[in-house]
Amino acid sequence: MTTDEHDSARAAPEKEAACLSPNVAVLGIVSLLMGMSSAMIYGLLPVFLVTILGASTTTVGLIEGTAEATTSAVKIFSGVASDWIGRRKPLVVLGYTLSAVNKLLFPLAESASIVLIARIADRIGKGVRDAPRDALLADVTPSAIRGSGFGLRFALYTVGAVAGPIAAIILMTLSGDNFRLVFWIALLPGFASIGVLLIGVKEPPNQHPDERGWLPIRRHDLALLGAPFWWAISIAAIFSLGRFSPAFLVLKAHNIGVDAAFVPIILVIMYSIYCAAAYPFGMLADRINRHLQLGIGSLILVCADVMLANAGTLWLTGLGAALWGLQMGVTQGLVSAAVADAAPERLRGTAFGILDLAVGLATFAASAGAGVLWTFGGAASSFTAGAVLAAAVIVMLLFQFTSKRAPASGR
């Protein structure tokens, strides 16, 4: 019997009895509210930077990339800290609070440098919360349905990511393109998320209270993260190099002539498809080979980038954004589930911190590079480069399937 067959046989009775914890839904609602707050701001921010503050596309790319790199640097520490102290919720609450408070800087910004500070401060909050939150979700979700759990949280997050741009469009229309007013109103759901988190999430007791050492992380601990874990990290990083910030989708819409008040519609399209796909494909990740599903997602991303590179009309740009959202729904939950399954329970915070660090550094390089390519070669060059890197993931996965030296597939 192969490793995959053994895992499937062992998981079969577990799947029949397993059900999602209420904590998963509450964490999803918290993500929905903060996602709505962020999307109301970020759906307009690239155009705000270019048209109001006079920033270049290169500057937009550097701001987005620097923000993601900052998030990644913080995530590794917060993940390790949550493992060391044996508590997840305090760090999750701290992270959401930092993000909500630091969003006050956006409506006050008078220069691109202030926006950069605001983005970094906001992303520090995201960095503090993400790895402990994902580790908490993994802690309360049985392995057999972990893909479903992450898929549900991503699906609820994308509900907020859809509602945010819709609210921004309505408010921009009613206010006569008053960016700052929209940014002020966007603070409300962000602060609401903190209340839901404090009241609704019940953290389980620490299952390893006697295993904390003098150091938060030791060489022995890293040795427990085996080859399947590092293989998943490598693929996730390469994949992220081809998937830069959605801010470039907004700029693409503005580039083809969409009015500032309506550019968030491109995010509505993307996140609507993402929302519809995340939970079903999260469940699918519990039932089929995850490398195959990642390969399908990579192929969809190649198609999306090729379409966006050549799109000159709103409907083609919208179709490209829809494909972009589909690949996010196909891939997002399965990467998190694969990392959770490959890491020991007491090192899950560390594992997600490493994942987020790798993905964030790759996203920084992708966004900064996309901004430079856009400035000197136009939108087509940025999206074409993304397609090439997404195709590289497909090549890696094919190598994994055909090479005897590659780690075994499955969970």
Predicted regions and their residues:
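Juxtamembrane intracellular "pre-TM" segments in multi-pass secondary transporters
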Residues: 5-21, 203-235
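Glycine-rich segments within core transmembrane alpha-helices of 12-TM secondary carriers
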Residues: 151-166, 358-366
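Helix-loop boundary and gating motifs at the non-cytosolic
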Residues: 14-68, 229-266
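C-terminal membrane-cytosol helix-exit motif in multi-pass small-molecule transporters
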Residues: 187-209, 396-401
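Helix-to-loop junctions at the C-terminal end of transmembrane segments
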Residues: 74-86, 172, 277-289, 374
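Structural signature of the two symmetry-related core transmembrane helices
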Residues: 90-104, 187, 292-307, 387
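Transmembrane alpha-helix termini and helix-breaking/packing motifs in multi-pass membrane transporters
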Residues: 47-52, 163-181, 365-381
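Cytoplasmic helix-loop-helix junction between adjacent transmembrane helices
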Residues: 118-157, 338
